[in-house]
Amino acid sequence: MRVLTKQEIAEACELIAQDAFCADIFDIATETLRFLDPPREISTLEYSIEHRKIRQSDGETADWSLDLTPYLAQPMAALDAPGIHEVIVPKPARSGGTVVAENYALKTMEFGPAGDIMWYLAGPDEVGSYAERVFKPLFEDHEGVAAKIGGGPSDTTLRRKRIGGYTVELLAMSGKTTTNRQGRFIVFDEPDSYSKKFTSNFLEQGRQRQRMVGSLRKIY
C-alpha cells in the first residue's frame, strides 16, 4: 500500500468533483434500454427467410431458402408451438435438420423468448469442429445477434457466448456436462454418435436439465 501525497489527494479530489471516475450516464442508458424493447413476434420460419445466412465453403454467405428444404417448415413450427416441448426429428445425414435448431436458436437470441441454450455434441473433437465451421459464423454473419453479445472478456469465446445475461454453449456429452446445469433450449446433435451410456437416455438427461424452466422449455 502506498500513501498518497497531499498533491495527489488534491488532484484525486478534483477528478472526483468532475465525475471523472463515473461512467457516462448516456452510455449506461443506451446499453440498458435495448433490453427493454419488447420482443418482436416472429416465427422461426419468418426469421429464417428474412435473416438467416448460410456460410458457403468459399467463405461467402447465401440467404437460407425454404425452397431447398421445404420439409423443414414443420419442425420449425413445432419448436414455436407453445404446447410442444420436445421435437424429435429422425433424419438421414445432411438433410438440413440441424439448421432447424440453429434457426430457432438465432431467433430466440435476437427476438426471444430468451434463455440459456445448451448444444450437445458427441465429444471434444465434434465440439471443436462445429465451433469453427458453424458456431463462429453464426455470430459473425448475423449482426442482430452479434450486437447482443456481452462486452466482458469472458462473454465471447469460440464455444460460448453470453447474450443478454444468458449463455449459449457447445458441450461435449458427458457426465460432467450434464449435471448441475439448466437450459431453456437444449439441442442433442447427432445423438446416435454419443457414447452408449448416453445414446439410450439423452432425452431424459434433457428433461432433468429443464425441471425448473417451466412451459418455455424446448428440446430438439
Regions found by a protein language model. Give the residues of each.
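Phosphate/NTP-binding elements of NTP-utilizing enzymes
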Residues: 2-220
